[in-house]
A protein has these predicted regions:
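Non-catalytic accessory/interaction domains
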Residues: 2-206
Length: 206
């Protein structure tokens, strides 16, 4: 950055000039990164499957967003692994046991929950010690509703089950915003009526 400022201290330079300077300093080709991360819009959908981590470009352009993600998975205890994603499929033998797909919020994209993580969070969401992890869990479940991997009714039942014990106001407020969107947009009238009484008691207790 100092070289960049010295070189163009009295003239105009664009972003590409900075990228070229970084390339010469780092000895790496940054053009692909520059195109995907800076010049183009969009974000990947990232799913964890038995054979690994699948990155999908919903625009159909088959783009890949190189990045590293912090994955929490459960095999004889909760474990954390930092995984570099460099292709549309990244092998990961514990993909089906993932609990939090982007636990430290290092990644970029839509991270969908697995069937295992949905069952795990149903039981253990409130027991996650770090409020960041609980926030990540709610975000993943919300994304699951948007992508039809989690039923809206199930999300609301999780809110009724776990949110009354939540002490972090940021987690509560953000999750309640998810609840409002799901209730008004992703539930039909019959589903709303079925959960209405439980939801009213929940709102009173909150």
């Amino acid at each position: 950055l100092q070289r960049y400022l010295r070189r163009w201290s009295y003239s105009n330079a664009d972003w590409d000039e900075l990228i070229k300077l970084l390339e010469s300093t780092m000895g790496q080709d940054l053009q692909a990164w520059n195109e995907i991360w800076i010049k183009e819009s969009g974000a990947p959908v990232i799913e964890f499957q038995k054979n690994g981590i699948v990155m999908t470009d919903e625009s159909g352009k088959n783009r890949v967003w190189p990045q590293a993600v912090s994955v929490f998975w459960d095999y004889m205890g909760l474990k954390r692994t930092l995984i570099p994603l460099r292709d549309s499929l990244t092998p990961f033998r514990y993909g089906a046991a993932v609990v939090l797909p982007d636990g430290d919020v290092m990644g970029y994209g839509c991270f969908l929950p697995t069937d295992f993580s949905i069952r795990f969070l149903d039981d253990e969401l409130g027991n996650l010690n770090d409020p960041l992890y609980r926030a990540v869990a709610w975000q993943a479940l919300y994304e699951g509703v948007l992508h039809k991997k989690v039923k809206g009714e199930f999300f609301l039942k999780l809110c009724i089950k776990h949110l009354p014990q939540e002490k972090n106001n940021l987690v509560v407020n953000r999750t309640l915003s998810f609840l409002r969107i799901i209730y008004s947009t992703y539930l039909d009238e019959g589903s709303r009526q079925l959960i209405q009484d439980d939801l009213e008691r929940f709102c009173i207790n909150m």
